[in-house]
A protein has these predicted regions:
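A short, aliphatic-rich beta-strand micro-motif
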Residues: 103-112
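Allosteric cytosolic regulatory segments
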Residues: 140-147
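Short N-terminal helix-loop-first-beta-strand/juxtamembrane motif that initiates sensory/input modules
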Residues: 31-35
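Signal-transducing coiled-coil linker helices
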Residues: 7-22
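Short beta-strand-to-loop transition segments that serve as allosteric relay/switch motifs
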Residues: 55, 119-130
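GAF sensory/regulatory domain recognition
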Residues: 24, 36-64, 68
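Acidic/proline- and glycine-rich, intrinsically disordered low-complexity segments
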Residues: 58-82, 93
Length: 172
């Protein structure tokens, strides 16, 4: 895993490319059917599934938006419970979890280096799976890598905008 992560980070690539590789590795470590990255718009109270990897019967759709207030991820954060292998019992009123058939859920929030909340990195399965310290550590490591990459992309965009403004100003 470490070698693959190093190779992924060494290549200059898009956020999507990096995340897809990390989701695949996360699936192997967690033994979950689906792994996915979400972005949360706290003001609009919406959670958007940006990228998902589905390897078995469970299918978490990409480009799918759900109410943040009723999501498993928000409940996990609010209750400080980032793993459950009893989702139907613990969060049985969560419609999305029930419709997707989620039994086991693992999640971690993603905070950008400036401290702002970005979204979540999650893994889910319709089968009961055991908690693993290794899986949780990898999940948190990958969340940190994604946060760093997002921050890097934002800084590069700011530099491009500043450069364009300087060029435009030089013509005046």
């Amino acid at each position: 895993i470490i070698a693959r992560v190093s190779q992924s980070l060494a290549k200059e690539q898009s956020l999507e490319s990096l995340v897809r590789q990390l989701l695949e590795m996360l699936e192997m470590v967690t033994d979950m059917e689906s792994t996915y990255l979400t972005k949360v718009d706290v003001e609009a109270r919406l959670q958007h599934i940006m990228f998902a990897r589905n390897s078995q019967k469970m299918h978490i759709p990409e480009n799918f938006t759900v109410s943040w207030d009723y999501s498993l991820c928000k409940r996990a954060i609010d209750e400080n419970c980032f793993f459950s292998d009893e989702v139907p019992d613990r969060w049985g009123d969560c419609i999305a979890a029930r419709n997707l058939g989620i039994t086991t859920f693992l999640s971690t929030p993603i905070h950008l280096p400036d401290g702002s909340f970005y979204g979540t990195l999650c893994a889910a399965s319709s089968e009961k799976r055991q908690w693993s310290e290794r899986a949780e550590q990898v999940l948190q490591l990958f969340a940190g890598l994604i946060a760093q990459y997002i921050q890097k992309e934002a800084l590069v965009e700011q530099l491009r905008e500043a450069n364009a403004a300087l060029i435009a100003q030089s013509y005046t």
